[in-house]
């Protein structure tokens, strides 16, 4: 993200991602109060300052529910890609839910927009072969478990260990 482009696109599909996204937004705003957030989230992210492209509060991005609304999610993806083309955000931050967010990552990469994945999908447990896809689609991952950093480093995916957001809230 450049000094002149302070637009951040951020996408969280599930309620837990919405909480993590809101916390991340607050942290980024503390560092730079001139940043503006656009994207997909729910109530927590809207309260933290998200300019929502689509009301996701009644949408479920969990696997079985998402299948029943596939045409809706296709339209939402198209809205996001139009936003990428029109507004050219400085960075796209994706939170969990690779089933939808990988599509956004692919579109952003094609347009030359940097992609950061925060709270990565647990591909180390549910399909380690997908790390190749992650390497192609993202510029950096921000991981929450210490072992994830070495997993991504070995695969050649630039990574930063941030710690688990829940542990920060507890301590």
What is each residue range found by the language model?
Residues 6-171:
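Active-site and donor-binding regions of nucleotide-sugar-utilizing enzymes
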Residues 1-3:
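Short, flexible hinge/linker loops that cap or flank conserved catalytic cores
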């Amino acid at each position: 993200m450049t000094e002149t482009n302070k637009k951040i696109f951020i996408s969280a599909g599930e309620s837990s991602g919405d909480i993590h996204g809101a916390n991340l937004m607050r942290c980024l705003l503390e560092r730079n109060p001139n940043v503006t957030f656009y994207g997909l989230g729910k109530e927590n992210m809207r309260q933290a300052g998200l300019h929502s492209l689509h009301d996701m509060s009644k949408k479920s991005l969990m696997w079985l529910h998402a299948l029943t609304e596939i045409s809706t999610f296709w339209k939402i993806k198209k809205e996001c890609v139009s936003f990428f083309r029109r507004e050219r955000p400085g960075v796209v931050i994706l939170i969990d839910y690779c089933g939808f967010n990988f599509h956004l990552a692919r579109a952003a990469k094609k347009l030359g927009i940097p992609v950061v994945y925060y709270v990565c999908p647990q591909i180390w447990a549910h399909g380690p072969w997908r790390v190749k896809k992650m390497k192609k689609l993202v510029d950096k991952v921000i991981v929450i478990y210490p072992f994830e950093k070495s997993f991504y480093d070995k695969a050649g995916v630039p990574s930063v260990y941030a710690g688990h957001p829940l542990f920060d809230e507890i301590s």
